[in-house]
């Protein structure tokens, strides 16, 4: 019998060790897997590469990992926000490396990884510092830069409802980067507001269970 459920976030994140690359779902403060991130902070895995849209806000989530000095590199599209205090402290101190890319490029690189594609050419960033060191081409009279697929060892994502097979649904805009990260990572871990005892209706499934290694219930909605 397939049952991908874990007792709690602490059990779910046990496979994550030092030096891992970790995709983290969320956009701003919506759809962030706070339960899994808090458990990862408590575990203390170090030298992490965090891939997310933002670089954390306040004291929780990604910010908690930065505060504890567990992050070696951040890959994101929007590192500075009014609440990104811990990222700014670590970055200015030279303790965290940063790779920035346009938001659409970030999403498409992950989608390419999840779809088994070898990368893509995009006009976004052509002729700017973001294109330095990358392959460029002129196609149809327009400049393009090549972007490779972006994968990760793990993805931590937040869903609304899941079943024991790992099928997930999402709540409104809390969906954001979560589905594409679930596909792009080699080992995806989900927290959901509710684990259903019955299979999710196929029309409700956004992320099929084939992409989810494990899931746990974390009822608190940030």
What are these regions (language model features)?
Residues 1-222:
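Conserved alpha/beta enzyme-core scaffold
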